Amino acid sequence: MRDIKTYLSVAPVLSTLWFGALAGLLIEINRLFPDALSFPFFSF
């Protein structure tokens, strides 16, 4: 039971940090490459 409580208290913190970092990364990519439907370094 103690392990379950530890997991339930750690998982929301880790997911909040992960989604916050992911949102920040997406915001910075959209700031550097505005309205980019296809990135120039991925098109061959």
From Swiss-Prot:
Function per UniProt = May help in the organization of the PsaE and PsaF subunits.
**Record InterPro entries:** PSI_PsaJ, PSI_PsaJ_sf
**UniProt KW Glycoprotein keyword:** no
Q: Which organism is it from?
A: Oryza sativa subsp. indica (Rice)
User: What is one term from the GO cellular component aspect held by the record?
Assistant: plastid
SUPFAM superfamilies xrefs:
Subunit IX of photosystem I reaction centre, PsaJ
> Mind listing the UniProt keywords for this protein, alphabetically?
Chloroplast, Membrane, Photosynthesis, Photosystem I, Plastid, Thylakoid, Transmembrane, Transmembrane helix
Task: List the GO biological process terms.
Answer: photosynthesis
The listed locations are:
Plastid, Chloroplast thylakoid membrane
Name the family: Belongs to the PsaJ family.
Q: Which domain of life is it from?
A: Eukaryota
Q: Which HAMAP family match?
A: PSI_PsaJ
Q: Where are the transmembrane segments?
A: 7-27
**Pfam families according to UniProt:** PSI_PsaJ
**UniProt membrane topology term:** Single-pass membrane protein
Q: What is the recorded name of this protein?
A: Photosystem I reaction center subunit IX
